[in-house]
């Protein structure tokens, strides 16, 4: 269901009271006996809201202490790089974390400009720090760095988030996050006895070092993006940071590489009063959502396109991207991934390792599969979650990793790792490179792909379920699917493991020649998600979705 106010400008009633949100961060103490108030530390870290007693000072004290203990056990002896985004709760949590880290004797690197720090910038800082003298990546030995990013990503303004990046620079694997969460919950009830150094004292200590995140990241971008072709073409790129952490990075790119990137909306406002409402009636800073981006698109259609050839967007921590093209609007992330893959693997990155694959999540469009087959590139299909790309990117087994929720990263031009977390800045820059090199914008190139590979229709539907049903998903096997056809086509695969790495997908994927669906339970809500795609017709997609529910119900024994 799309909310009635989706795509409408935010009203005063939609805005948070920043003082209340920050005040409750400090004043409200969670009860460890209430499940909703405990630490839940997934691959995107711990997320919650001070208004719901799920993101408060106690949580951050306990989580940071757990991280300090974990890195000590793991032998991580180098600095910890810490950054924050523009959410109201991010600065208080950032300060709390520094107090605990310094009390634990951890060397902490903070931004020398006292600026916001995008997620990919922290990843890139960790990876370059951990690079050996011969240019290879180290993940064992003395002096290795790790990091923390304080962000709930594109979540609403009420929310806070706190995630840990180990020495591989990307989302921590489940065994690490589970250990941190378990220890944090042990500490939560007694958080006041955890040692801290008051912030003003901590930042003056020798343990807190200033690091120019912005300079370090931006100067290195020329090793990932072809700025020469962008500059010589005169492509006019606009960027909407959506009030997020990338806002001050684009002007430095102009300065360093003699570009003319225009920051469309440079304001930072923790209420995000300038946004249009997302599909569910909330303010959500998602650069791939046509509803959240409607204000920008309307202004472009009302004359602003005279200034730009294309516009890119990033979310609050700049790990997600959005691409907006004239006469098209916001591109579907699946479509943009397919365009990127054909461009990058089609001769424009000759320094990439031979045989390095294209990484995609199993709920991303099969258009990517068709493009990969046409250029004879290896496809590596993994479960949902960018954490599955960390090791393959780190080791150069994939040169590109992308997911349907507008997250991607790819290797440097010389084939070495760039980031192992999602990077929302380089896809925006790549869109300008692609336009400059091909003479067509990504939407036009997508239309060319549709002419060659066929048009597809894609949809995600959420279905209510129970905790008992959710538990059954993990135990499914292909044998639990008794159907032989889906939407009139013979079933060609019944998957409960991802073909690219044989990891359990926590659900089910069923494919035919021109259709597929995947079903998996939500990690945070009592719903299961069904993703589906058809290369036949919109009506066939509806049929796939209808039959998917029957297949899932029967497989679960309902």
Where are these regions (language model features)?
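Metallocofactor- and cofactor-centric catalytic cores in central/energy metabolism, strongly enriched
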Residues: 57, 116, 121, 516-518
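Short beta-strand segments
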Residues: 83, 147-153, 313-316, 401, ...
């Amino acid at each position: 269901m799309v909310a009635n106010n989706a795509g409408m400008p935010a009203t005063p009633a939609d805005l948070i009271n920043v003082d209340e949100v920050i005040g409750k961060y400090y004043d409200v103490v969670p009860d460890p006996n209430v499940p909703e108030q405990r630490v839940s530390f997934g691959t995107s870290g711990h997320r919650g809201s001070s208004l719901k007693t799920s993101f408060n000072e106690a949580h951050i004290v306990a989580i940071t202490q757990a991280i300090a203990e974990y890195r000590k056990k793991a032998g991580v002896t180098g600095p910890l790089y810490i950054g924050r985004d523009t959410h109201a709760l991010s600065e208080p949590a950032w300060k709390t974390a520094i107090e605990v880290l310094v009390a634990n004797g951890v060397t902490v690197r903070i931004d020398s400009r006292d600026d916001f720090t995008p997620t990919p910038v922290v990843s890139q800082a960790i990876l370059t720090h951990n690079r050996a003298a011969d240019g290879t990546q180290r993940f064992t030995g003395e002096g290795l760095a790790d990091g923390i990013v304080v962000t709930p990503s594109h979540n609403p303004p009420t929310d806070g988030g706190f995630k840990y990046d180990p020495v591989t620079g990307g989302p921590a694997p489940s065994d690490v996050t589970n250990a941190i969460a378990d220890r944090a919950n042990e500490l939560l009830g007694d958080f006041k006895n955890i040692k801290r150094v008051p912030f003003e004292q901590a930042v003056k200590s020798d343990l807190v070092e200033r690091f120019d995140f912005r300079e370090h990241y931006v100067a290195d971008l020329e090793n990932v993006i072809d700025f020469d072709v962008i500059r010589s073409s005169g492509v006019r790129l606009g960027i909407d940071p959506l009030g997020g952490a990338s806002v001050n990075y684009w002007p430095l790119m102009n300065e360093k590489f003699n570009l003319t990137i225009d920051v469309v909306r440079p304001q930072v406002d923790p209420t995000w009063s300038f946004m249009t409402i997302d599909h569910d009636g909330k303010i959500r800073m998602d650069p791939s959502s046509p509803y959240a981006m409607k204000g920008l698109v309307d202004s472009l259609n009302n004359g602003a396109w005279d200034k730009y050839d294309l516009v890119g967007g990033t979310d609050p921590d700049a790990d997600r991207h959005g691409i907006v093209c004239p006469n098209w609007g916001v591109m579907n992330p699946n479509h943009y991934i397919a365009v990127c893959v054909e461009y990058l693997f089609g001769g424009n990155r000759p320094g990439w390792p031979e045989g390095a694959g294209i990484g995609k999540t199993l709920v991303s469009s099969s258009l990517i599969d068709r493009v990969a087959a046409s250029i004879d590139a290896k496809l590596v299909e993994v479960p949902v979650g960018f954490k599955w790309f960390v090791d393959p990117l780190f080791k150069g087994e994939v040169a590109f990793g992308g997911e349907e929720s507008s997250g991607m990263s790819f290797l440097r031009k010389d084939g070495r790792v760039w980031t192992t977390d999602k990077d929302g800045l380089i896809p925006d820059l790549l869109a300008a490179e692609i336009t400059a090199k091909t003479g067509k914008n990504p939407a036009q190139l997508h239309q060319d792909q549709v002419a060659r590979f066929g048009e597809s229709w894609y949809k995600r539907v959420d279905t209510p379920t129970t905790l008992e049903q959710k538990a059954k998903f993990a135990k499914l096997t292909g044998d639990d699917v008794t159907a032989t056809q889906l939407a009139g086509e013979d079933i060609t695969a019944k998957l409960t493991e991802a073909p690219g790495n044989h990891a359990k997908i926590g659900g089910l994927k069923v494919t035919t020649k021109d259709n597929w669906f995947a079903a998996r339970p939500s990690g945070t809500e009592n719903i299961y998600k069904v993703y589906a795609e058809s290369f036949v017709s919109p009506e066939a997609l509806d049929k796939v979705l209808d039959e998917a529910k029957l297949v899932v119900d029967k497989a679960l024994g309902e």
